[in-house]
Amino acid sequence: MATVDPIRYPIGTFQAPQQFEAGEVQEWIAAIRGLPSDLRTAVSGLNDEQLNTPYREGGWTVAQVVHHLADASMNAFLRTKWGVTEDGPTVKPFAESEWAKTADACLLPIEPSLLLLDGLHARWAALLESMTEADFHRTVRPEGAAGEMPLYVLTALYAWHGKHHTAQVASLRKRKGW
């Protein structure tokens, strides 16, 4: 079994749930709702030099991680909406590494992305809280993937995703003594 890089994956890799568990779903929703606050705490007090430091060698800068979380959350919110309102929609992936190179991800301060996350995650959590168990069993079909993804798995994935990237920033701060 391959060793997981603890700098790249400080909370481990994503483990997809095999079945729907209402209690777990509530934890995932809480994580999604809490991401903006958790991320703000992780980046609080960092100066421009620190924000422009890669969280690992060859990795994104802290600022790029923040902007990536905004990009990924927008995509995940839309995937959730499509999954709830359409029958098994195909959802397009986004080229994360290319998006991280765009001017808004490289040059813009992080505050616009933090503000976007505040509103978006409030809406996303409200949507998730309104969903029934049947809704969470609805699926999306990631373009190029072998099968369908139930919305409860998508929810788990993005709950993990936010914690994963927030932990990357927190880990960098700890390693650097910031």
UniProtKB/Swiss-Prot annotation:
EC annotation from Swiss-Prot or TrEMBL: 3.-.-.-
UniProt keyword Zinc present: yes
Coiled-coil segments: none
Co-factor note (free text): Binds 1 zinc ion per subunit.
Ion transport keyword on record: no
Amino-acid positions noted as binding Zn(2+) in the UniProt annotation, renumbered to this chain: 68, 161, 165
Names of required cofactors: Zn(2+)
A Pfam match: DinB_2
Record InterPro entries: DinB-like, DinB/YfiT-like, Put_metal_dep_hydrolase_YfiT
Location relative to the cell: Cytoplasm
Source taxon at top rank: Bacteria
Principal location: cytoplasm
GO molecular function, one term: hydrolase activity
Signal peptide range in chain numbering: none
Chain ranges passing through the membrane: none
GO CC aspect terms: cytoplasm
Keywords assigned by UniProt, alphabetized: Cytoplasm, Hydrolase, Metal-binding, Zinc
Subunit structure comment from the entry: Homodimer.
Family indicated by similarity: Belongs to the metal hydrolase YfiT family.
NCBIfam families in alphabetical order: PRK13291.1
Functional description taken from the UniProt entry: Possible metal-dependent hydrolase.
Protein's name according to its UniProt entry: Putative metal-dependent hydrolase GK0616
